C-alpha cells in the first residue's frame, strides 16, 4: 500500500511505529504534524475537509484503541488534535486537472464513447454489482427504495431511449469493455473530493450573498464563514422587484459554478446551455429551501419562506411580502404563487427540516438534482458525465455517513430519503417553469433576459 505523505512536510517527529491516536503498534508514520496510522490520518483529513462536527454521547472521555470495534468519533477527533494533528496541514481540494484544448475534442469523443459503451454493456441483463455505490436498493430499508417513487422512473438510464443513428455511426464498433476500458474516467477526483467540491461551492455561494445582500460583507472576507448570511429577526418583505435582482445574482452564481464544475469543459454549446438551466433552477429553488430552514430551524405557526436575498413572505396568507407593486397587484401574485409556495414549503422545506439535513447532505442533494432532474433533456454524453458524478457523490456520501453514524441502516435510510426527495424537487421544478412561462406569455411581471432565454430551451 502506498504510504500517505504528510501534508505538513518534515515536522521533526522522531520515527515511531506506534499510532499516537489509536495506539496501533505498527502503523505509525508522520501525518499532519503528528504520528498516526493511515486510518486515523484519513479520519482526520475527512473530518476537517468536510467540516464534520461530532458529539460524544457519554462524558467526552471515551477509550480510543485500535482493537475496539466501535470507537467514539468525537473523542477520536479530540485525541487526534491532542496528539498534535493540525487542521492547517490538511490540504484543500486540488483543482480539477486542466486538459489542453487541442486534445479536448479527441478526449471528449473517445472517453465519452467508451463510457457509453461500458454503460450499455452493464445495463444489459439483470446483472448488479454489490460493490457499486449505486446499489442503493441493497442498502436502503423497506419503504425507502428509489423505485417506490413514481417520479424516479424518469431518472433511470435506459440506452434504448437513445435514438439510433445508423446512417452516421456504422463505423462505430460494438465491443465489450476490457479492464483498461472499465478504468476510463472523465472526472479526475474521487467521491470524497467531489463531495468536498460541492460543499465548497455551497459555502462560496453563501459568502457571495453575504457580500451583496447584507451589512456584514466583511465577515465573508475575514472569516470564510460559508453559512447562511441572513438575519431572521427583522427580514425585509419580499417583492418581485427584489426577486428580479436576486434572480440575476443567482444566475451569476450558477455561471461561476458551471465554469468550474468537473466535466463542463467536455460539453458542447447546446449541452452547456441545458446544464446551465439545471444549475440556475437549483441555485434559485433549492437554495430558497436551504436558507429558509437554516433561518427558521423550527417551523412557526405562520410559516414563511426566505428568498436568496434575505427577504421573506408568508406562505398561508397575504399578511407579509404580498404588497401591490408597480407591475403586478397582490391579487395576481396570489393566483400565481401562493399555492405553489404552500406546496413548496410542505414538500421541500419541511422534509429538509425534519431530516435535520447537514450542509454536506444538502450540497450532495443539490448536486444530484442538477445532474438528474434534467435527465430527459440530456444528450448521451451528458448522461455519461452525470453518471460519473452520481456514482462519485454516492460513494462520498457513504464515506461521510460511515464517519458520522457508523451504522449501515442509518446510511441507507439517509441516502434513501435524499433520493426520494429528488422526485419532489423534480415536481417543483416543473411547476415553477410553468409559472414563469405563463408570466412571460402574459407579461405579468418583469423577467431578465437570461431567464427568458432559459425558458425557451
UniProtKB/Swiss-Prot annotation:
Pfam families: Hormone_recep (PF00104), zf-C4 (PF00105). Residues 16-92 bind DNA. GO terms for molecular function: DNA-binding transcription factor activity; RNA polymerase II cis-regulatory region sequence-specific DNA binding; zinc ion binding. Residues 162-171 have a biased composition (Polar residues). It is found in: Nucleus. GO terms for cellular component: nucleus. It comes from the Eukaryota. Its main location: nucleus. The keyword Ubl conjugation does not apply. Belongs to the nuclear hormone receptor family. This is Nuclear hormone receptor family member nhr-20. It comes from Caenorhabditis elegans. The gene is nhr-20.
Amino acid at each position: 500500500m502506498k504510504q500517505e505523505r504528510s501534508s505538513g512536510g518534515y515536522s521533526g517527529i522522531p520515527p515511531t511505529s506506534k499510532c499516537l491516536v489509536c495506539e496501533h503498534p505498527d502503523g505509525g508514520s508522520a501525518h499532519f504534524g503528528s504520528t498516526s496510522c493511515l486510518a486515523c490520518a484519513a479520519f482526520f483529513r475527512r473530518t476537517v475537509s468536510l467540516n464534520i462536527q461530532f458529539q460524544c454521547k457519554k462524558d467526552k472521555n471515551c477509550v480510543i484503541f485500535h482493537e475496539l470495534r466501535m470507537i467514539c468519533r468525537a473523542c477520536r477527533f479530540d485525541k487526534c488534535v491532542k496528539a498534535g494533528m493540525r487542521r492547517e496541514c490538511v490540504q484543500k481540494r486540488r483543482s480539477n486537472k486542466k486538459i489542453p484544448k487541442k486534445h479536448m475534442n479527441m478526449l471528449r469523443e473517445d472517453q465519452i464513447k467508451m463510457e457509453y459503451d461500458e454503460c450499455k454493456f452493464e445495463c444489459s441483463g439483470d446483472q448488479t454489482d454489490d460493490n457499486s455505490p449505486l446499489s442503493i436498493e441493497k442498502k436502503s430499508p423497506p419503504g425507502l427504495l428509489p423505485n417506490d417513487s413514481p417520479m424516479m422512473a424518469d431518472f433511470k438510464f435506459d440506452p434504448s431511449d437513445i435514438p439510433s443513428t445508423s446512417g452516421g455511426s456504422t463505423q462505430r464498433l460494438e465491443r465489450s469493455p476490457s479492464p483498461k476500458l472499465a478504468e476510463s474516467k472523465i472526472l479526475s477526483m474521487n467521491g470524497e473530493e467531489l463531495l468536498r467540491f460541492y460543499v465548497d461551492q455551497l459555502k462560496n455561494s453563501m459568502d457571495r450573498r453575504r457580500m451583496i445582500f447584507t451589512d456584514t460583507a466583511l465577515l465573508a472576507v475575514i472569516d470564510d464563514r460559508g453559512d447562511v448570511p441572513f438575519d431572521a429577526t427583522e427580514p425585509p418583505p419580499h417583492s418581485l422587484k427584489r426577486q428580479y435582482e436576486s434572480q440575476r445574482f443567482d444566475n451569476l452564481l450558477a455561471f461561476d459554478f458551471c465554469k468550474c464544475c468537473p466535466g463542463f469543459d467536455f460539453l458542447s454549446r447546446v449541452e452547456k446551455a441545458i446544464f446551465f438551466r439545471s444549475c440556475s433552477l437549483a441555485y434559485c429553488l433549492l437554495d430558497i429551501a436551504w436558507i429558509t430552514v437554516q433561518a427558521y430551524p423550527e417551523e412557526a405557526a405562520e410559516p414563511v419562506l426566505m428568498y436568496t436575498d434575505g427577504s421573506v413572505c408568508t406562505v398561508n396568507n397575504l399578511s407579509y411580502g404580498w404588497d401591490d407593486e408597480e407591475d403586478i397587484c397582490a391579487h395576481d401574485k396570489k393566483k400565481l404563487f401562493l399555492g405553489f409556495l404552500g406546496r413548496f414549503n410542505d414538500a421541500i422545506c419541511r422534509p429538509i427540516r425534519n431530516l435535520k439535513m447537514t450542509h454536506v447532505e444538502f450540497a450532495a442533494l443539490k448536486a444530484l438534482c442538477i445532474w438528474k432532474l434534467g435527465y430527459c433533456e440530456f444528450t448521451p454524453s451528458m448522461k455519461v458525465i452525470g453518471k460519473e458524478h452520481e456514482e462519485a457523490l454516492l460513494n462520498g456520501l457513504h464515506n461521510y455517513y460511515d464517519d458520522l453514524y457508523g451504522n449501515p441502516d442509518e446510511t441507507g435510510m439517509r441516502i434513501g430519503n435524499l433520493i426520494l426527495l429528488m422526485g419532489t424537487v423534480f415536481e417543483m421544478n416543473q411547476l415553477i417553469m410553468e409559472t414563469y412561462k405563463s408570466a412571460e406569455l402574459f407579461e405579468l411581471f418583469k423577467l431578465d433576459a437570461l431567464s427568458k432565454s432559459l425558458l425557451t430551451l
